[in-house]
Amino acid sequence: LLSRFNLITGGMETIKRDSSLAGFGIEYETDYQTYMSRLLDEQLVHPDDADEFRSIMTLDQLRLRMFHEKGSVIYRFRRKFKAGYFWTSLELFPDAECSKENPWVVMVIHESPSVNPDL
């Protein structure tokens, strides 16, 4: 999934969908807060990863990282698909001018090589 993501409004504009990430209709969400709530409430994030995911991926944490530290975020977690949980990467890339006035970042979500085949 390739999207533009607004760190102020939470709006997500999909540029390209990846059919391998399809499942449970979550790939059609356009609001970050709704997307995150569904991932957690529907246990689409593995229960062992949920607390860390919840703390790292809040809009406030992402704004701090993007606006002040000017760093990208790369987070790997186990996400549920119809066939079970698979390692997934969620990556956010700001440009050098990322700020409250220019809050757009690139979001990429893709399958990640498993670091532990037994999950």
Q: What are these language model-derived features?
A:
Residues 75-84:
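PAS-family sensory domains
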Residues 117-119:
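PAS/GAF-family sensory domains
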Residues 2, 45-46, 53, 57, ...:
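Long, contiguous hydrophobic alpha-helical segments, chiefly transmembrane helices and signal peptides
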Residues 1-44, 96:
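PAS-family sensory domain signal
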Residues 70-72:
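Extracellular Ig-like/FN3 beta-sandwich strand-entry sites
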Residues 2, 62-64, 76, 94:
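Generic recognition of flexible, low-complexity loop/linker segments
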Residues 30-57, 61-68:
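PAS/GAF/H-NOX family sensory domains and closely associated sensor/linker modules
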Residues 86-115:
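Short loop/turn elements at sensory-signaling interfaces that couple input to output
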